[in-house]
Amino acid sequence: MKNYWNCSVSDSEMNLKKKQMQKNFKNTCDSVSETFVGSGIPSSTFGKNGDIYLDRTTQYYYKKNNCIWIKYFCNGYCCFKGCKGGFFCQKGDKGNNGNNGNNGEKGQKGLKGIKGDIGDKGSKGDIGEKGDIGDKGDFGDKGIDGNKGSKGDIGDTGSKGDKGDKGDKGSKGDIGDKGSKGDIGVKGSKGDNGDKGSKGDIGVKGSKGDKGNKGDKGDNGLSILSGLDIPSPDLGMDGDLYLDTITDELYKKINGEWIEITNLKGEKGEIGSKGTKGDDGNKGNKGIKGDKGTTGDKGDKGDVGNKGDAGDKGDAGKKGEKGEMGNKGDIGDKGNDGIKGDFGSKGYKGDKGSKGTKGNNGFKGDRGDKGDKGSKGDKGDNGIKGNKGSKGDKGDNGIKGEKGESGSSILFGMGLPDQNQGEDGDIYIDTLTGELYRKVNGLWVPEIDIKGDKGEKGDRGNVGDKGEKGDIGLKGDKGEKGEKGNVGDKGDIGTKGDKGNVGDKGDIGIKGEKGDIGTKGDIGNKGDKGDKGDIGNKGNIGNKGEKGDKGVKGDIGEKGEKGDKGVKGDKGEKGEKGEKGEKGEKGDKGNKGDKGNKGDKGDKSDKGDKGNKGDKGNKGDKGNKGDKGDNGDKGDKGDNGDKGNKGDKGDNGDKGDKGDNGDKGNKGDKGDNGDKGDNGDKGNKGDNGDKGNKGDKGDNGDKGNKGDKGDNGDKGNKGDKGDKGDNGDKGDNGDKGDNGDKGDKGESGSSCQIENNDGVTIMSVCTPGIASIQAYQYEITDISGLENPYDPSNISGLNFKLFDTVKGAFRTGNFTADNMTNVGINSTAMGYHTQATGSGSFSFGNNTNGIISSNGIGSFVMGITTSSGVIISEGDGSIASGYSTNSSTIEIQNNSLSSIIHGYSISGSSMRLMEGNIGSMIIGSSETGSIVQSGSGSIASLINVRATSGTISIGSMSYGSKIFGYSNNGTITISDNVHGSQISGIVTNNGQMTIGTLSHGSYLHGYADTSSTISIGTNSFGSECIGLAQNNGTINNGDLSFGCRISGWTLSGLLSTGSGSCGTILYGVAVNSGIINTSGRNFGCFVGGYCAYYGKITIGANSFGTICHGTADASGTILVGTNSTGNLVVGSSQGTISLGSTNFGSVILGYTENSGSIISDGNNRGIFMHGYSSSASLYTASGSCGTVLMGYGTSGSAINVSGLGSFTFGYCPSSGEITQVLANGSFAFGRNNTTVSENSFSLGYGARSYMPGSMAFSSFATSGNPLRAGSAQTIKVLTRNLNTEFVLADGNFPTLPYTGYGNIKAKIIGSSGTMSVLYFQVFFDGSTHTVTIPTTPAGGQIVYSNPVAVSPAPTFTPVATVPGFSVTIANPGTQTFVASFGIVNIS
C-alpha cells in the first residue's frame, strides 16, 4: 500500500533558519500553509497554524492547529489545503484532501502517549530497585546450610529452613523485580489512552479544511507520494515527488518518468547522534524487563511455599540417616560456619524474593498513568478533525485551484539554483548538498540542508521505538495478578517448596541454626566419646592428621631419598606432577592417624620406587603415569618424580585403604587418602551404633536399631573396599529413613548429603574431600585431588571440575585415569592431560608426556606436549594446534573435512592431515627429520610450513592443494595424481621439492640450493615449474609431461624437461656449468635462455620439431642432441652452438664470436646452417650429407663444410677461411675457399683445391700457394700484369709449394682485344723454379687474335722468377692484361 501526500512544499525542514524565514513571512495570513519534511516529532517552536509537517521516519504527518502539531497517519491519499494566497499555500490546499488521512488515526493510538508513558515507567523501574533487597532473600539460601545444622536436635527447626529453600524460588522473584519495570510498561497501557485519540472526532474542526477545498486547485501543483520500493511509472504526475520509505530515496517525475533526485538518509543520521535526548524513552526499556516480572509471579510460588508446611516430605531426609555417617560429619562441625547461616535469616528477606511480586510494586507503574500526559496525543485527536476534512472532497470542485499551481514548485538541480529559474515561493533542492532554497522576491534564499538535521530528530524517533517495548511492559500488569496469588498456584507445583514451608518454621529456626550448630557441638561431644569408642584414634587422629599433613610431607621427604635413586628423576618434569602428589600428602594427614604408620609400610612399597620411574606412580597410579615418564627417561621428569616419591607413600596409603580391613590399617588408610578413610567411617557407623547409645538421636532410636546394622558396620570395615559402594550404603541409610520421621533429623545429618524431593537431584559430601552432585540434567563436581575419577588408580591426575550427566560432558583440569577413558559426546576438556574423545569435543592444553586428543567430529585440540607428546584430532572439521616435541606428532586423522593443524613439531615429529582431509590446512614448523603431511585425497588442502631434515607432503589424489614451505635437507612433495596443485618454497642441502606423476595443471615455484631438486613428475600435463637452482640444484619436469613449462635460473645446476615431453617450454639462465635441457625424445618443445661459463642449453637426443633459442656466452653451449629431426637452433654464442650428429632436416641460425663455433656434427642429413662468425667457426662435421651452410666470417673465422654433397657459401676476410670443402662432392663458394676433399669444387677469391678430382677456381690469390702436394689437381689462378709481368693480387708470383711438375696453360687477354694462349711446364726442386717451353707450338704460344690497331703485336714468354713463375710481356703497348693459369699439378 503506497501512501500519498499532496502538499504544496516537500522535503524541507525547519530550524533556526526557518524561524528566521518565518520572520520574513510574518505578514502572511494564517491561511498560508507551509509543508516541512523532517525526521522525528516536530518542534512546537516552528510552523504556523495550518502548516504541514511530514516525519519521513514514521510516515506520520502533523498539522498545526492552535499552535499544536496534531499527528495523522496517511494510509490513503491525503490532501491538506491552505489558503490560495501566500507562499506554498495552494499546494497545501491539496493537503486538505489529505483529510483522507483519517486513517492516520491509527497512528494516534497513543504513539505519542507511548513516549510519555515510557518516561513515567522508567520511574517505576526505580521502585524495582527495592526488589534488590529481595536478593537478601538469597541469604535465605544460606539458611539451607543451616539445615545441615539440623544434625543438632534443633535441626528439626532447620527443616523449616527448607522453607527457606522455597525462598530460593523467591529468588526467581528477583527476576520479578525486573517485572517492576514491567509496571512501567503498564503506562504503556496508557498508550491505549492513545486510543482516546479517537477523540480526534473533535477534529471536526477540520471543517476549516473546507477552505482547503480551494486548495484542490493546488492539486495540479505537486504531490508528495511515498511507498515501499521504487515508484510505479503509472503513479503520479509530472512534477510530483515520491519518497521510498525503505531507502529514503527521493524521486521527481519528469516527462512521465521518475528520476532519482537525492537520498534523504545518510549524513543526517550522523547528526542524529544528538537523538540521545530520547534517553528518557530508555526508561521505557525497563518496562521491557517488566516482562520478566511475569516470572516474578513464580516468586509468588514462594508464597505457596507457605503451604509447604507439608514439608513433612522431608521424610526423604531419612536418607539423612546416612547422615549418621555425618557423625563423622563431626567434621561437619565446620558446618558451624553454617551459623553464619543465621545471617541467612535475612533469607526471610528472601521471602522478599517473592518480591517478584514487587513486580506488583510495578503497580506503582500506575504512576505511569502520568503517561496520560501522553494524552496530549489526544490533541492528535484534533487530527481526527481531519476526518471532517473529508468534506474536503467538496474541495474537489476547487480544482480551479489549479491556478494555484503558479503558487510554488519544487525544483531540483546539482549546484546553486539559477536566479532566472522558478517563481517566488518555489522550492529548490541542491541534490549535491541537500541544501534547500526558497525563492523570495526573485532571490533564492537558502533555508536548510535537508540532510542531517532531520537525522537528529530521527534519533528521537528511535527512542520512541523503545517506548513501544514499554508496551510489552504491560505484561507487568499481569504481575499484579500475581499478587492475587493466581500465579502462586503455579507455586503449588513448587510443592517441593512445601518442604520449604517447613522451612518457614525454619525461619525461626534459622536463628536456631546457630543453636543447631551448637547442637552439633553437643553431638560432637558425644561423637567424641563415640569416636574414642570407635577406635576414635581413627577419628581423633584423623582430625589431627589433617594438621599432620605437613608432617606427612616430611615423612615423604624420607622417601624422597629413595627418589635420589630416581636419578632418572631428570624426568622430574613429570615429577612436577608428582608435586601434585603432594596433594597426596594431604592424604598423609591420615598418616598422622597412626595408621599412617602403615603408610610407612607403603614405603615398603619401594617397589613403588620403581614407580619412581613413574615417580608419579609412587603416588600410586600417578606414578604409573610416571611410567610414561619412563618414556621420558630423559629422566628430568624423574627428578620431579622424587617428589612423587612422597606421593608414593600416599599411593601406598591407598593400598592401605584396602588395609582398612585391618582396622589399624583403617587408620593408615584414612591417613593416605583420608577421604577413603571416611569410608572407614562406615566402620564408624558401627560406632554410630554406639551413637545409637547416643540414640538420643536414637530418639529415633529405631535408628539405633539400625545402629545394630552399624554393628554390621564393623563388617563394613570390609566394606571399605566397597568404598565406591559407599554411595550404595547411603541407599541403606535411606532404609533408615524408612524407620521414621526421626530420620528427618537425619536430614540434618545431610551434612554429608542433601537430596531434593525429586529423588534425582542429590548433593553429597559423604566422601571426604569430594562434593558430589547428582542431577537429572546438570552436574558439577569439584574434586580436591584426593579421590577417584575414575580410579585405577588415576596415575598422577585429579584436580578437576566435572560435568557430565549422561555425557553432556565437561571437565577442567589435570585428569587421567586414562584421562577418564573416552568420555565423548558433547565433551569439553581443558588443562594438562587433556583428552576428549567424541563428537563435538573440545580439548585444551599442556600434556607434557602423553596425548592431547579430541577424537571426534567437530573436535578442537590445542596444547603443548613435550617428550613424545601427541596432539591428535580425528574427526570432521577438526582443528589441532599446539607445540609438540621429541618425536611428537600433531595429527588430524582420516576423513577429517576442513581440518586445520597449527603447530610446531621438532625432533623427528610429524604433523599430518591423514587421508581424505578435504580443504584441510597445516601451518607450522616441523624440524629435525619431521614429517609434515596432508594425506591422500586431501582436496584443496594447504600446507604452509618449515621443515628441517624432514618431509612436507600432500598425498595422492589431493586436487587443488598447496604447499608453501622451506625444507632444509628435507622434502616438499605433492604426491601423484594431484591435479591443479601448487608448491612454492625453498629446498636446500639435498632437499627436494616435487610434484608427483600424473599431477596435471600443477604449479611448482621455488628455490633449490646445494644439490636440491625442484621437479614435476612424469605424465604431468599442463604443469609449470619455476625457480632457481644453484650449487648442483635441479629444476626438472618429468618424462612424458605434455604442454608443461619450466623457467628459472641455475648456477651449476640443471633446468630440464623429462624425456618424451611434448609441447613443453623450457627457458632460463644457466651459468657456471649449469644446464638448461630437454632430456630427449621431446616433441615440439621450446628451449630458450642464456648460458655462460660452461653452461649449456640443450635439446636432448631423439627430439622432433623442437626449438632451441638462446645465448651461449663465455664457453657456454647451445646444443641439439643426436638423432633429432626437424629441430631449430637459434642463438648467439661466444661458446658453441651445435647440432648433434645424426640430425635430419634441422636448422641452425646464429652468431658466434671469440673462438666460438656453430657446428653441425657428423652424419647429419639435409641440415641448414646460417650464421655470422667473428674469430670463430661455422662448420659441418664429416659424414654429413646435403648440408647447406651460409655465413659470414671475420677476424680469422672459418666456415667449413665437411659433408658429402654439401653446399657452403659465404665470406671470410683475408685472415680467415670460408668453407673448407672437407667432404667429397661438396661445393664451396666465396672468399678464401679451400677444397680438401676429392671431387669437390671451390669457387671464389683465394680458392684452393688440395685433393684429387677436385677443383678450385681462384681469383687473384693473395697469399700462399694455391697448389698442394698430392695427386693431380686442377687449379685456376687468376693474375694481372704489373708492368711487363703477371703477378697475383698481392704482387707476388704464383708458386708450386711442393717439388714436382706443374703443366700450365695460360690464357692471356688484353684490354685492346689481344688474346693469346701459352703452354709451358714448371718444375720445382724445392728451392728453384725452372720453366720449360715446348717447341710445339713455337715458343709454346698461340696467338688467337691481335687487332690491327695494336702494333706491334705483343708477345708473351713464360719465365722462372724468384720465387715462382710468370709470363713476361713484350710490346704491351697501352694494354692491360689478365692471365688465367690453369694448372695440373703432378707431385
From Swiss-Prot:
Q: Which InterPro entries match?
A: Collagen, Collagen_Structural_Proteins
Q: Give the coiled coil ranges.
A: none
GO-annotated cellular components: virion component
Q: Where in the cell is it found?
A: Virion
Where is the stretch described as Disordered? 98-219, 268-422, 454-753
- Coarse class of the primary localization is virion
List all Basic and acidic residues biased stretches.
Answer: 114-181, 189-199, 207-219, 268-340, 364-382, 390-405, 454-535, 544-747
Q: How is it modified after translation?
A: May be hydroxylated on lysine by the viral-encoded procollagen-lysine,2-oxoglutarate 5-dioxygenase.
Which positions are glycosylated?
6, 794, 814, 819, 826, 846, 886, 894, 969, 1032, 1077, 1123, 1200, 1224, 1232-1233
Q: Which residues form the Collagen-like domain?
A: 95-154, 161-220, 266-325, 344-403, 450-508, 512-751
Superkingdom, natural source: Viruses
What keywords does the record list, in alphabetical order?
Collagen, Glycoprotein, Hydroxylation, Repeat, Virion
Q: What's this chain's function?
A: May participate in the formation of a layer of cross-linked glycosylated fibrils at the viral surface thus giving it a hairy-like appearance.
Name of the featured protein? Collagen-like protein 6
